[in-house]
Amino acid sequence: MSRLTLFAPLLFGLLSAVTGALGMTVRLPKNDWFGIRMHVVMSSDAAWLAGHRAGGPWLFAGGIVALAAGVGLLVFCPDASMGARIATSSLVGAFLLAGVAAWRAQTAARRFL
């Protein structure tokens, strides 16, 4: 199994979980690197905070799904084909949760336009 297959879920999960946790606790400052990067969310500081407060839990959940998949790949899955299926399905789930986070953030941030 390739290193990318092993570490992509871990890296994506860690970044998503940390970003989600900081966002929902209102400790993620507006920046150019991390967070939900949508025009409406970035339109003001109030929109940024409201968007991340609303989307943070979903982003955190997606990160936990990806982290669990990464740990599962490292511990339980030496078979390459099974590992690829686990990584793909878990990352699809994590990306869907990130999509819900973006939708929730956009909805919350629109109140500040």
Residue ranges and their predicted role:
Residues L67-G72:
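Alpha-helical transmembrane segments of multipass membrane proteins
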Residues C77-F112:
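C-terminal structural segments of small proteins and small subunits
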Residues V18, L49, R53, V100-W103, ...:
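A broad detector of short, well-ordered amphipathic alpha-helices
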Residues R53-A66:
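Select subsegments of transmembrane alpha-helices in polytopic membrane proteins
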Residues R3, A47-A50, A54, P78-R85:
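Juxtamembrane loop-transmembrane helix junctions in multi-pass integral membrane proteins
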Residues P29-L49:
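Cytosolic, membrane-interface loops and tails of multi-pass inner-membrane proteins
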Residues G20-G35, R104-A105:
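Membrane-water interface of transmembrane alpha-helices
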Residues L4-T19, A87-F95:
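Alpha-helical transmembrane segments
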